Amino acid sequence: MVNDKLDKKMLKAIFTIGFLIFGQISLADPFIVIENKLIYDTENSEEATEIAFGHEEELLKILRTHTDIDTLVLNSGGGMIGAANDMADLIIDADIKTYVEGTCESACVTMFLGGRDRTLALGGKIGFHASWWAPDSIEEYYNSEKEDEGWETPFDFASWLYEDTQAEILTEFEYLLGRGVKPQFAIQTLRAGSDGMWYPRRKELLEGGILTE
């Protein structure tokens, strides 16, 4: 834990030095532009603690305004997968590179895979785990949607949820394979439960198609 805190402080110091040397363009938190690089950092942000809806809109504005950006630097523990999916689409459309300086976990990996070229800093980590849905959030969704969806009992909802989960897994696998990830590695991304995290070594990331170099 102490080392993690030191690593985060060091990362923030590196970014700060970069700002002083190259100049910084202030944007909506957690985005920062330094020359031709766009930094997306939810780990050292003053406001954003995770990938969130609204970030995809800001990313679109930035990429349209700063057309010289060719690399997205990521440092995030994840967040809302829907927002990550939307940003991944923008990254693919912009045909830019992605680079992990510190940590990229969970939904952040979806964004990372959108990169044309995908690289990892020495000591950087890329983490995978199974998705999850909090019980209270499931209950809230059921109560708000049951009339529109025609769920007469929780069992009707459970049946829908079973099918929807399979569809989401299929969509995720199609995305992984479409971005050049090897089928066997795609299966292994589910090895860690929703409360765990799998950090493959660099060799595994290269052989699995996550890193391009």
Regions picked out by a protein language model, each given a short descriptive name:
Residues F31-W132:
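Cleft-lining beta-strand/loop regions that shape enzyme active-site pockets
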